[in-house]
A protein has these predicted regions:
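N-terminal targeting signals for export/organelle localization
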Residues: 1-59, 189
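A short beta-strand-turn-helix
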Residues: 55-77
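Acidic helix N-cap motif at the loop->helix transition within catalytic regions
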Residues: 69, 120-123
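Short pre-active-site segment immediately N-terminal to redox-active cysteine/selenocysteine motifs
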Residues: 75-77, 82-85, 151
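Conserved redox-active cysteine motifs that mediate thiol-disulfide chemistry
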Residues: 81-98
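Thiol/disulfide oxidoreductase modules built on the thioredoxin-like
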Residues: 124-132, 137-188
Length: 189
């Protein structure tokens, strides 16, 4: 083997390229885990389950003053945290809008909370998906802290009693709506 080939082999087997390769492989593994764990997960371990839901007052996205979860006392509320740049949020928006009339007829509502987003982008998102349910804006992330939000979307089902009845991390599905929301609507509608 010539000295050029031997030098290349020595450089490839030196610790630095091996460390870089190990780092890249670890990053790929973490990314894969993150994508796999971004699937919808009902959160039976949420620290808020069966507790009274926090009710921070936030500005309405449409500019019509402020509101909070307290304004929906006695209703079943699907409290959905989202952002316009969140791909899973884009995927679930049509489903949430499709369920809104059913919720309204039975004394409930979807209540969207746009978090850490550019206001113009959030408004464009609402227009694009034709969202008609109320949306509040958490520009600095305070309310997401109260709910322990880890990623978007994250959704909480608030019963008529103001307590968190269910939670889901990731996209809401029709199955989740049927199993976790409809029974609450039927209880005393």
């Amino acid at each position: 083997m010539n000295t050029l080939g031997l030098g290349l082999v020595k450089r490839l087997l030196s610790p630095i390229p091996l460390i870089v390769l190990a780092g890249v492989l670890a990053l790929v593994a973490l990314l894969g885990y993150g994508l796999a764990s971004n699937k919808t997960k009902e959160s039976s371990t949420s620290t808020l389950l069966n507790k009274v839901a926090p009710t921070p007052e936030l500005p309405k996205l449409d500019g019509g003053g402020k509101s909070s979860l307290a304004a929906y006392k006695g209703k079943v509320v699907l409290l959905n945290y989202w952002a316009s740049w969140c791909e899973p949020c884009r995927q679930e928006a049509p489903l949430l809008q499709r369920w809104q009339p059913t919720l309204e007829k039975a004394g409930g509502t979807v209540l969207g909370i746009d978090v850490l987003d550019v206001e113009g982008d959030a408004r464009a998102f609402v227009r694009k998906y034709g969202l008609t349910y109320p949306i509040l804006r958490d520009g600095n992330g305070d309310s997401q802290t109260a709910y322990g939000i880890l990623a978007y979307p994250e959704t909480f089902v608030i019963g008529r009693n103001g307590r968190v009845a269910a939670a889901v991390r990731g996209e809401v599905t029709d199955k989740f709506m049927r199993q976790s929301v409809l029974p609450l609507l039927e209880k005393s509608s």
